[in-house]
Curated annotation (Swiss-Prot):
The keyword Hydrolase does not apply. Its EC number is 2.7.11.33, 2.7.4.28. This is Putative phosphoenolpyruvate synthase regulatory protein. Belongs to the pyruvate, phosphate/water dikinase regulatory protein family. PSRP subfamily. Disulfide bonds: none annotated. It comes from the Bacteria. ADP binds at A156, V157, S158, R159, C160, G161, K162, T163. InterPro entries: Kinase-pyrophosphorylase (IPR005177), PSRP (IPR026530). Keywords: Kinase, Nucleotide-binding, Serine/threonine-protein kinase, Transferase. It comes from Dechloromonas aromatica (strain RCB). It is an enzyme of class 2 (transferase). Pfam families: Kinase-PPPase (PF03618). GO terms for molecular function: ADP binding; ATP binding; phosphotransferase activity, phosphate group as acceptor; protein serine/threonine kinase activity. The keyword Transferase applies.
């Protein structure tokens, strides 16, 4: 069996790091045979912090025996220059795209930290925080209160990716995303939980290949009926049958990234 290639990746930002991480992930997913160790360095706003980041990056490179990869979204040219002195392969989104965009638009950018997320007082920021809180409070069917406020309600059997997808929708798009598990009792009744019936237009289903679900569940609860391949096949077949019968839009998440799943949901439910 070939040895898996391992590389360390740093995401360095003067803000939360969500933007640079999302951009980096979109590139990293193109290299399926490499195992990436990911380290985030957010809120880098001073020379001292930049120097500390360089020391950390260099130390990691010495430990790995291979230089790290560094993705940055540092607006301040001085801080960006310091980080680029690290013994690493550095990719700056602002250095790569901002200058050509300034040339095309014929105007200099503001070089203002945090413009992509807005200030803490902005309505967009508040909306995103509210969405994250709502999503956490409505994870895995914890409660069915206030479902009328949801932008989307994900349904699937356990371990199909409902929670990470819900959080991604909340964090990246400011959507209130609830999610509910489909359980054996639902299959016995042959219909959706009653609390979801009146919110049918907001429902979106996730499914997965039974073999992949078996692998995931074995890591959580090995040698159990819950994780058995036979049970995984049964649950997936019943869930897909129910979603077809109820007219719920759904997709197979087996080989898709959270970004791809989320984009499909946005398009199918016309949320963007």
């Amino acid at each position: 069996m070939p040895t898996t290639i391992k590389r360390t990746v740093f995401f360095v930002s003067d803000g939360t790091g969500l933007t640079v991480e999302a951009l980096g992930h979109s590139l990293m997913t193109q290299f399926e045979d490499i195992e990436f160790k990911q380290i985030r360095i957010p809120f880098l706003t001073s020379v001292e912090q930049a120097q500390e980041a360089v020391a950390r990056i260099n130390g990691q490179g010495e430990s790995d025996g291979m230089r790290p990869i560094v993705f940055t979204t540092l607006v301040n040219p001085e801080l960006s220059s310091i980080v680029h002195q690290a013994d690493a392969f550095c990719l700056s989104y602002f250095d790569t795209f901002l200058a050509p965009l300034e040339a095309e638009l014929g105007i200099k950018s503001n070089h203002t930290v945090g413009r992509s997320h807005g200030s803490a007082e902005s309505s967009e920021y508040k909306k995103r925080i509210e969405s994250i809180n709502y999503t956490l409070a409505h994870d895995d069917g914890i409660t069915d209160r206030d479902l009328e406020e949801a932008d989307v309600i994900l349904v699937a059997v356990s371990r199909c990716g409902k929670t990470p997808t819900s959080l991604y929708l909340a964090m990246q798009f400011g959507l209130k995303a609830a999610n509910f598990p489909l359980i054996p009792e639902d299959f016995d009744r042959g219909r959706l939980p009653g609390t979801l019936e009146k919110h049918r237009s907001k429902l979106f289903g996730l499914t997965i290949q039974p073999e992949r679900l078996h692998q995931i569940r074995e890591e959580r609860r090995a040698a159990s009926n819950y994780a058995s391949l036979a049970n995984c096949r049964f649950e997936i077949a019943e869930a897909e049958k129910m979603m077809r019968r109820e007219g719920i839009r759904w997709l197979d998440s087996s080989t898709k990234s959270i970004e791809e799943i989320s984009t499909t949901i946005l398009q199918e439910l016309k949320l963007r």
